[in-house]
Amino acid sequence: MKFAQPHNPLLPSVPDIVFSAIVLAIVLPFFWWFVIPRISKLLSDRSSLIEGKISEAASAHARALETLELRKQQLDEAKSEASQIRQEARDDAQLILQQARETADETAERVMLHAREQIQAEKAAALLSLRSEIATLALAAAGKAVSEKLDDDKKSRELVSASIAKMAEDAG
């Protein structure tokens, strides 16, 4: 009789090992041809999808950066254009102000010239009137002197002086 060795509880029994090997031989090809390829395909598809999303995000990020740069450039151009427009407006305002001053100066000069001409005309008319008045008074004085038949030069001078004084009073 052989001594039976005691059974180790940690090791499976021989029938369990044989049954497990048969089940594994049946199930392993099924997993190898059907389940593993599907899982691999699913993981590959998921990986491709994630990589596609990452590349889309990268291209969207690149487009966003390009758009940002474009907007910055447009903003800089708009600022430059606005600055140029403001400068042109200042220049135009200075030109308009200068033209207005020149027009005002020309108008003032014309008014002054017209006033001088009017003063000269009135002065000439006053002188003409004064000469006419003096001539009339001189004739009147001469007529008076002749009518009184003055013999004396002294009296004649007094009469002329009185006539001139009267003329000065009438003129003033």
From Swiss-Prot:
Pfam families: ATP-synt_B. The keyword Protein transport does not apply. The chain crosses the membrane at residues 17-37. Keywords: ATP synthesis, Cell membrane, CF(0), Hydrogen ion transport, Ion transport, Membrane, Transmembrane, Transmembrane helix, Transport. One of its GO terms (cellular component) is plasma membrane. GO terms for molecular function: proton-transporting ATP synthase activity, rotational mechanism; proton-transporting ATPase activity, rotational mechanism. F(1)F(0) ATP synthase produces ATP from ADP in the presence of a proton or sodium gradient. F-type ATPases consist of two structural domains, F(1) containing the extramembraneous catalytic core and F(0) containing the membrane proton channel, linked together by a central stalk and a peripheral stalk. During catalysis, ATP synthesis in the catalytic domain of F(1) is coupled via a rotary mechanism of the central stalk subunits to proton translocation. F-type ATPases have 2 components, F(1) - the catalytic core - and F(0) - the membrane proton channel. F(1) has five subunits: alpha(3), beta(3), gamma(1), delta(1), epsilon(1). F(0) has three main subunits: a(1), b(2) and c(10-14). The alpha and beta chains form an alternating ring which encloses part of the gamma chain. F(1) is attached to F(0) by a central stalk formed by the gamma and epsilon chains, while a peripheral stalk is formed by the delta and b chains. Belongs to the ATPase B chain family. This is ATP synthase subunit b. It comes from Tropheryma whipplei (strain Twist). The lineage of its organism: Bacteria, Bacillati, Actinomycetota, Actinomycetes, Micrococcales.
